[in-house]
Amino acid sequence: MATVNQLVRKPRARKVAKSNVPALEACPQKRGVCTRVYTTTPKKPNSALRKVCRVRLTNGFEVTSYIGGEGHNLQEHSVILIRGGRVKDLPGVRYHTVRGALDCSGVKDRKQARSKYGVKRPKA
């Protein structure tokens, strides 16, 4: 425990919070261009081919972004919007692609949780 005199000489240092999504630079989303679209395998014990893409953002960062939902239309040079949110079983993937924004289409035939996958309300 520090004495009053010690605290007068050198106050307590505040802990600096470290961002989980540094490339967003405190913005809710960022726009970027796909430089590579590919699949990768998750950590043990999971098994799949997860769809991801490398994205060059407008601020110069290059990050890996997960493409959620079944099927996508992304290819190299597609302009997409990314948001924060990591994928627990893919090391190094700390961003999600926003479906239904810019060049990324919504998920086809999606009926539930539509707002998360950029799908309009079906007609009747």
UniProtKB/Swiss-Prot annotation:
Modified residues (3-methylthioaspartic acid): D89
Result after altering K43R: Confers streptomycin resistance but not hyperaccurate translation
Keywords: Acetylation, Antibiotic resistance, Methylation, Ribonucleoprotein, Ribosomal protein, RNA-binding, rRNA-binding, tRNA-binding
Gene Ontology MF terms in the entry: misfolded RNA binding; rRNA binding; structural constituent of ribosome; tRNA binding
CDD domains in alphabetical order: Ribosomal_S12
Sites of N6-acetyllysine modification: K108
Alphabetical list of InterPro entries matching this protein: NA-bd_OB-fold (IPR012340), Ribosomal_uS12 (IPR006032), Ribosomal_uS12_bac (IPR005679)
GO biological processes: cytoplasmic translation; Group I intron splicing; maintenance of translational fidelity; positive regulation of RNA splicing; response to antibiotic; RNA folding; translation
Phenotype for K88Q: Confers low-level resistance to streptomycin and a 15% decrease in the translational elongation rate
Annotated Gene Ontology cellular component terms: cytoplasm; cytosol; cytosolic small ribosomal subunit; ribosome
Outcome of mutating L57H: Protein is not incorporated into ribosomes
One Pfam short name: Ribosom_S12_S23
Role description: With S4 and S5 plays an important role in translational accuracy. Interacts with and stabilizes bases of the 16S rRNA that are involved in tRNA selection in the A site and with the mRNA backbone. Located at the interface of the 30S and 50S subunits, it traverses the body of the 30S subunit contacting proteins on the other side and probably holding the rRNA structure together. The combined cluster of proteins S8, S12 and S17 appears to hold together the shoulder and platform of the 30S subunit.
Binding partners and assembly: Part of the 30S ribosomal subunit. Contacts proteins S8 and S17. Interacts with ArfA. May interact with IF1 in the 30S initiation complex.
Other information: At least 19 substitutions or deletions in 11 codons can promote streptomycin resistance, dependence or pseudodependence; all but one of the streptomycin resistant mutations (K42R) are associated with hyperaccurate translation and thus reduced translational efficiency. The streptomycin sensitive allele is dominant to resistant alleles.
Family to which the UniProt record says this protein belongs: Belongs to the universal ribosomal protein uS12 family.
Name of the molecule in the record: Small ribosomal subunit protein uS12
Organism: Escherichia coli (strain K12)
